[in-house]
């Protein structure tokens, strides 16, 4: 293809052993009932494909394209020193996620929310998954993961005479986010003891939750997205002063746009509570820049 088309395909399977995990130990064997030790095993398998092409290459015009896609599946295969099917897993510090054998890392561990006829969540009403007539921690279930199943990338670079235009886009498919800010939007939180209302997210007007429902899967939301990371425009003004100086001008925008169904600020933001937990108030900034490059 006259160096106009190239690509690569990789298939991988990786098993990681001896990861740290906190496990229970028999009474009297230590000064605590648990111990941090190397017992965790995780497998990662997937496929990566990339292709680069130059559809147009003439004296005045050159157009380069790049595309890549990756699929990954991670599964926890062991968390204990001995085989213990009754071991539920190790909960994360945020209380929303758990690591359990047979599931992805940082899977959400929540109650299954029930809804009324209009589709609105009912406060404090969850599905009794084990059918014992009581809603408790035994009704928590593994629901989705913050890790995307598919990751796409696309780049384009077009040059026409002295002008150039380039863009970079990314997409994550199959990743979920726990909307911690929405989970705190309750009516009890907007009532100040002094008698005036405080600010809250508008989701409180939809759910009408008075008390917190932080373990509801209602707040685990689809965070798949398409984002344009970068958009740039350049112009080469050429040489002047008897070819002693050259000038190139450029304009650039970062974080151009994002398309997503996620209801929070940003489907990629990572709060202080860990990956997949959104408790960040401030959105990711959009940056504009202008530049000039002098050549001597």
Regions found by a protein language model. Name each.
Residues 19-23, 63, 71-94, 174-199, ...:
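Outer-membrane beta-barrel and related beta-rich outer-membrane complex signature
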Residues 172-254, 267:
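Extracytoplasmic gating/loop element in the C-terminal half of outer-membrane beta-barrel translocons
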Residues 5-13, 47-55, 63-71, 152-158, ...:
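Membrane-embedded beta-strands that build the outer-membrane beta-barrel scaffold
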Residues 6, 93, 97-168, 207-223, ...:
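Outer-membrane beta-barrel transmembrane strand signature
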Residues 1-6, 34-58, 145-151, 279-288:
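Outer-membrane beta-barrel signature, preferentially recognizing the C-terminal barrel domain
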Residues 23-34, 89-90, 129-138, 206-217, ...:
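Flexible, solvent-exposed coil segments and beta strand-coil junctions
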Residues 1-30, 60-63, 70:
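Membrane-embedded beta-barrel scaffold of Gram-negative outer-membrane proteins
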Residues 37-43, 54-146, 254-256, 261-264:
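Conserved small-residue
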